[in-house]
């Protein structure tokens, strides 16, 4: 049984929604067990609430050490100035012991993201790949396998690097049906590859 972790950070719920769609897609693949977890919040609780952060996220909080228990990990993060959110950065910065032991070497990884206005969504994914490459992950983009990526009739997220959503400057825009379809495709695509490599 190939074990996949969908690991995310979400402040306002956009990445949480994409994470659910990613997991839904991954669960379509036979022989795969999917778990959704989130990284710890680093903001003080009162500051998080004052900023309008979503406090009712059901996914349990992960620890860095448990990453070694999975065959594949799909990371989700909002964009912060063109890079991953600080909460995800802080979590990954605690994986030095896993790097030293080679515990993540050869595992499958993929990345999805959210941006306010689209600025930095691709760079957020590809800059996250740098950290994953240092661990020796096999990085899986989605290419143009999702037909929704060819639709230019509306504003939407989605890249050949991974699923994305555009939240709007005030965070009011929720992931569209097309963005969720791309996320489901990513989950299924990564799960198929992980299942093959885990045999």
UniProtKB/Swiss-Prot annotation:
| Necessary cofactors | FMN
Give the catalysed reaction(s), semicolon-separated. a quinone + NADH + H(+) = a quinol + NAD(+); a quinone + NADPH + H(+) = a quinol + NADP(+)
Mind telling me which GO cellular component terms the entry cites?
membrane
* Pfam families in the record: FMN_red (PF03358)
Which residues does the annotation say bind substrate? 99
Q: Which domain of life is it from?
A: Bacteria
**Does the record bear Nucleotide-binding in its keywords?**
yes
The molecular function GO annotations come to: flavin adenine dinucleotide binding; FMN binding; NAD binding; NADH:ubiquinone reductase (non-electrogenic) activity; NADP binding; NADPH dehydrogenase (quinone) activity
> Which keywords are on file for this protein?
Flavoprotein, FMN, NAD, NADP, Nucleotide-binding, Oxidoreductase
| Cofactor remark | Binds 1 FMN per monomer.
Q: Where does FMN bind?
A: 10-15, 79-81, 114-119, 134
Q: Where is the Flavodoxin-like domain?
A: 4-190
Disulfide bonding pattern of the chain: none
* UniProt-listed Enzyme Commission number(s): 1.6.5.2
Q: Where does NAD(+) bind?
A: 12
Gene3D superfamilies referenced in this protein's UniProt entry, alphabetically? 3.40.50.360
List the HAMAP family hit by this protein, alphabetically. NQOR
Q: What family does this chain come from, according to its entry? A: Belongs to the WrbA family.
Protein name as catalogued:
NAD(P)H dehydrogenase (quinone)
Native species of this protein?
Yersinia enterocolitica serotype O:8 / biotype 1B (strain NCTC 13174 / 8081)
């Amino acid at each position: 049984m190939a074990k996949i972790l969908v690991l995310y950070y979400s402040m306002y719920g956009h990445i949480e929604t994409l994470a659910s769609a990613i997991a839904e897609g991954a669960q379509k693949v036979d022989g795969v067990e999917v778990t959704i977890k989130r990284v710890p919040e680093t903001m003080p609780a009162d500051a998080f609430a004052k900023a309008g952060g979503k406090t009712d996220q059901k996914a349990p909080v992960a620890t860095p050490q448990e990453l070694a228990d999975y065959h594949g990990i799909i990371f989700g993060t909002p964009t912060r100035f063109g890079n991953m959110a600080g909460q995800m950065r802080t979590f990954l910065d605690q994986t030095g012991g896993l790097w030293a032991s080679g515990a993540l070497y050869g595992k499958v990884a993929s990345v999805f993201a959210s941006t306010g206005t689209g600025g930095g969504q691709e760079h957020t994914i590809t800059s996250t790949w740098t950290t994953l490459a240092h661990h020796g992950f096999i990085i899986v983009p989605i290419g143009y396998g999702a037909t929704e990526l060819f639709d230019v009739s509306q504003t939407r997220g989605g890249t050949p690097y991974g699923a994305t959503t555009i939240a709007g400057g005030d965070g009011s825009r929720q992931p569209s049906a097309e963005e969720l379809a791309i996320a489901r495709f990513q989950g299924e695509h990564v799960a198929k590859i992980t299942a093959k490599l885990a045999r």
